A protein has these predicted regions:
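NTP-handling and nucleic-acid-processing catalytic cores
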Residues: 1-132, 207-237, 286, 294-308, ...
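Residue patterns forming the tRNA-binding/recognition surfaces of aminoacyl-tRNA synthetases
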Residues: 1-44, 99-253, 288, 318-320, ...
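Acidic, turn-prone loop/beta-hairpin segments
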Residues: 5-24, 250, 275, 351-352, ...
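A glycine-rich phosphate-binding loop feature that marks nucleotide/adenosyl-phosphate handling sites
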Residues: 7-16, 171-181, 246-254, 343-350, ...
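Structured, non-catalytic alpha/beta "coupling" segments that mediate domain-domain communication
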Residues: 52-61, 166-197, 438-464, 554-568, ...
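Metal-dependent nuclease catalytic cores in nucleic-acid-processing enzymes
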Residues: 112-123, 156-159, 321-337, 605-612
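Catalytic cores of enzymes that engage adenine nucleotides and/or redox cofactors via long glycine-rich
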Residues: 171, 227-232, 236, 240-249, ...
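C-terminal low-complexity, glycine/proline- and small-hydrophobic-enriched intrinsically disordered tails
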Residues: 439, 566-750
Length: 750
């Protein structure tokens, strides 16, 4: 660590140095000024600049040593316009002979490239700005104290009036802005503290290359190396009130001393006179780089440091890989001789639903607490418009917010929000946050509560005695589904695929458990006339639901912990621990055979429901189901054993296995066998034919009207794309319906 006079990015609003990564480059339209500098031989040379206010800081004009136009200018000096000060000509490869006149003004104290040229030619470093961006007393008195941009206008007018302007052109360029202040950043000459980062970076590069620390997704390692391979010395001092004050004390001769305190410095160096502590504070990221070990009692070696260092995983955003991640690795490797963490998981940024980065200036910030607890429109407007850096945008933000949230934001709950983020957490991708998603996961939370209420109702209606539950196909099927989901989820989580893990659990809970297992159990309990069997079915519900809660717990800790307590009370057992202390759906086992058997029964019931939907005439009828003998005898036996439950769910009169197919029937081909529904006695063929033909005629007419609209070139060219696509979808749906009706008519024809 050393102190030096150097150029830094200076934020004139906050009056502090900022790092390169805190600078945002913006494309702007400005003007470029061609200014004539009188020469000592009676002529002049023209240089171009977009910052005429910096001419008072010029200390040379540079041309390329290969530029033949200026070989005779070696001993000529130039006078800075509006002053009497002369500056030399220097030959430097920084100047491009192909750009403009080939001559550039060199202002070492106000341009990073010029600073390097100045070092090569031992030029004076002339700072002409105050820390607030106004011109200082190194400038002509007419401009002293003026804001830099006000001074620009006055200087350009004076240059024009005195004939120093050759021409002015419109010009597009990029200008640096402070990411927090949104003001133009100035290269500014100050005394700052620096950290020589090159040696530190070598170790930090090595640990990632050799796999001691890994990035997930791995493509972020490339970004890490790009920064680290081109690292510059790090300016670690800041001119702010907040932060760790730099532990340096100066004596009366301005000699610096480092120490833990003034007392430590005096004792270490035997100092008696007055000491003054450094006013600057450390860059936040310098302090933060010590986080992994400084918070654990370092430099003392203690149990906490040994236990928790290094840690396993750092979860962070890509925008602070260099700010924080790289610097933690550098510092920890230097001081602790080990890596701070073994894995770095990079999340995406959470943006608004249209993909815009959330910011106060855009008025699109969503506070997670407001999504959890809800917020009124009035409160939301206050949050989005209070203390704005750009108050002129206030009305626009109010209008936009009222349109998006006319009633404010309703309460969605913590677990619904948490699950939403899990579901959107695809590796390395930014998240476009759509409030519709959190509504869906609030419904999911309600679904879980309703599942518990169903179990609670069964216990209330039938009672429940704890004990060993005997095996049954429903419980074994559900247990196997839970087991497989748990296995898959553990794999996904190890790979940081929280989106895939949450999707699998969602499917398990909503479809397998709530839609099928509960429905099967409801019918099985209704049809049971055996108290032990009923108790067994309820016990299986409780066991499987607890396993569901274990699976859900990392994703929904609040709801699952609450429901696990209620479940224990329901079963009249003592809850011995929190879910987090238990396993990950540990009590389940795989049973592929049973799983496949009940899956096939579900396929049969689903097929019957599709047939009902496609044939409105039998939608609400009960009927016998015929299954062809192509179905395996083992599967026929399983269906027969569970016929009462299947009949109850599918609303059938009965099930029989035969190859005899009635003349009037509906057939559905399954995987290697057929489902047949006899129609005799269910419908009047003539009436049904008339109904189907009328419906077909209506559908054909709809197709004709929509197709005519889509054939109209004027409609296609003028209508919004979404409207055109909607009409195309209507045609597609109508064509599908037409095919279905024609198929039904064909079945009724002799």
């Amino acid at each position: 660590i050393y102190k030096d006079q150097a150029l830094v990015n200076w934020d004139t609003k906050f009056k502090t140095a900022i790092s390169d990564l805190e600078v945002v480059s913006k494309d702007v339209s400005t003007q470029i000024y061609y200014i004539k500098y009188p020469s000592s031989d009676g002529g002049s040379i023209t240089v171009a600049t977009v910052r005429p206010e910096t001419i008072f800081g010029d200390t040379a004009i540079a041309v390329n040593p290969t530029d033949q136009r200026y070989q005779s200018f070696k001993d000529i000096t130039f006078t800075i316009p509006l002053t009497s000060r002369t500056i030399p000509l220097v030959f430097d490869e920084y100047s491009d002979p192909e750009m403009g006149s080939g001559a550039v003004k060199i202002t070492p104290a106000h341009d990073f490239n010029d600073f390097e040229v100045g070092k090569r030619h031992n030029l004076e470093l002339l700072n002409i700005l105050n820390d607030d961006g106004s011109l200082n007393d190194k400038c002509p008195k007419d401009y002293v104290g003026m804001d830099r941009f006000d001074a620009r206008k006055k200087i350009v007018k004076a240059l024009k009036d005195q004939g120093f302007i050759e021409k002015i052109e419109d010009y597009k360029t990029t200008i640096p802005y402070g990411d927090r202040s949104n003001t133009i950043v100035e290269p500014y000459l100050t005394n700052q503290w620096f950290c020589n980062a090159e040696e530190l970076a070598k170790q930090a590069i090595s640990v990632v290359r050799n796999g001691e620390t890994e990035f997930f997704p791995s493509n972020w390692e490339k970004t890490y190396f790009q920064w680290m391979d081109n690292i510059q010395d790090w300016c670690i001092s800041r001119q702010l009130w907040w932060g760790h004050r730099i532990p340096i004390w100066y004596d009366e001769s301005n000699t610096p001393y480092a120490g833990f305190s003034e007392e430590d410095v005096r004792k270490k160096h035997g100092l008696k006179g007055e000491l003054r502590q450094e006013d600057d504070v450390l860059d936040t990221w310098f302090s933060s780089s010590l986080w992994t070990f400084a918070t654990m009692g370092w430099p003392e070696k203690n149990e906490k440091l040994n236990l928790f260092h290094p840690t396993t995983t750092l979860v962070t955003g890509f925008d602070i890989i260099f700010f924080w991640v790289a610097r933690m690795i550098m510092m920890t490797k230097h001081f602790m001789k080990e890596v701070p963490f073994k894995e770095v998981y990079i999340t995406g940024l959470i943006k608004d639903e249209s993909g815009q980065k959330m910011s106060k200036s855009k008025g699109n910030i969503l506070d997670p607490i407001d999504l959890i607890d809800g917020v009124s429109l009035e409160e939301l407007l206050t949050k989005r418009t209070e203390g704005m850096m750009q108050p002129q945008l206030k009305e626009k933000i109010i209008k936009q917010t009222k349109k998006q949230f006319p009633e404010g934001i309703e309460s969605y709950g913590t677990d619904a929000l948490r699950y939403t983020f899990y579901s959107l957490a695809s590796p390395g991708r930014d998240i476009n946050f759509d409030i519709g998603r959190i509504k869906g996961y609030r419904n999911f939370c309600n679904k879980i509560w309703n599942a518990f209420r169903f179990i609670e109702m069964q216990v209330a209606n039938h009672g429940y005695q704890t004990g060993e539950s005997s095996e049954n196909i429903l419980s074994d099927w559900m247990g196997s589904k839970i087991f497989q989901t748990a296995e898959n989820c553990q794999t996904h989580i190890k790979q940081y695929r929280f989106d895939l893990a949450s999707a699998e659990i969602y499917e398990l809970v909503w479809s397998n458990f709530c839609d099928w297992y509960i429905e099967f159990s409801k019918v099985a309990i209704q049809k049971s006339d055996d108290a032990n069997q009923t108790n067994n079915l309820i016990g299986s519900l409780i066991t499987n639901f607890y396993s569901i809660l274990e699976l859900l717990h990392p994703f929904m800790p609040f709801i699952t912990e609450e429901l696990s307590s209620k479940l224990a009370d329901l079963a009249e057992v003592e809850k011995s621990s929190f879910i987090i202390e238990g396993g990950f759906a540990h009590a389940r086992a795989s049973n592929k055979e049973t799983e496949q058997q009940l899956d096939e029964i579900i396929n049969i019931i689903s097929a019957i429901r599709v047939i009902r939907a496609e044939n409105q005439n039998i939608k609400n009828e009960t009927f016998n189901l015929i299954i062809s003998n192509d179905l395996s005898s083992e599967m026929q036996s399983v269906i027969s054993k569970n016929e009462s439950v299947i009949v109850g769910i599918a609303k059938l009169d009965g099930i029989q296995f035969t190859d005899k197919i009635p003349l009037e029937s509906i057939e559905k081909t399954m995987d290697g066998y057929k489902l047949i529904i006899p129609l005799e006695g269910l419908i009047d063929p003539e009436e049904e034919m008339m109904r189907l033909q009328k419906e077909l005629a209506d559908v054909e007419n709809d197709i004709k009207i929509i197709s005519s609209k889509l054939a109209n070139e004027q409609f296609i060219s003028k209508a919004p794309t979404a409207v055109v696509e909607k009409e195309k979808a209507k045609v597609s749906d109508a064509e599908s319906k037409k095919a279905m009706l024609e198929k039904s008519i064909a079945k009724l024809q002799p």
